[in-house]
Amino acid sequence: MDAYNYSIPLDMTENAATSRLFSSMPQSLFTIAASENVTLNNHHYGIWTNHFKETDSLNSFFNLLSTNKDRAGNEFVSTIESFKYPIYGAQWHPEKNNFEWAKSPDGTPKEAINHSPQAVLLSQYTAEFFVQEARKNNHRYENSDEEDAALIWNYPVTRTPSSSFVQKYYLKNDF
């Protein structure tokens, strides 16, 4: 799959507009997601659309919301959601529009990330959607000490300018 460092619009399926993920998206943002290069794809592997459609265990569990074509014109699955559960899959990176600004030594961007206001709006919408989904979960920590121990702020952030990620967290395998 040739979809590395590749920003493209989503090819929405007929299911997208009524999906949980996209149904509350403002129409103007839905149009942006479907027509502007606001989704960064950064992968060599994925699920081909024909494989998804031919595999009952996938197409009976997941609703296909969008597809895309790699540089060679091969169609792949780009957004899915479970029919029944709050399980989602995005082959694109909605988090990067807001937060990844890595540059090469010559000052050029390391990745083809769109940082336009429209791309940032898509990132913010997606983040807010997932926060709202997480709030539906009734799992809680036993106490505030247990919760505090699990926070990301307990781990140092490492600046990694030579990487495509500006910052990284290195977590100990102690949980």
Residue ranges and their predicted role:
Residues 1-175:
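Amide-donor transfer/coupling interface in amidating biosynthetic enzymes
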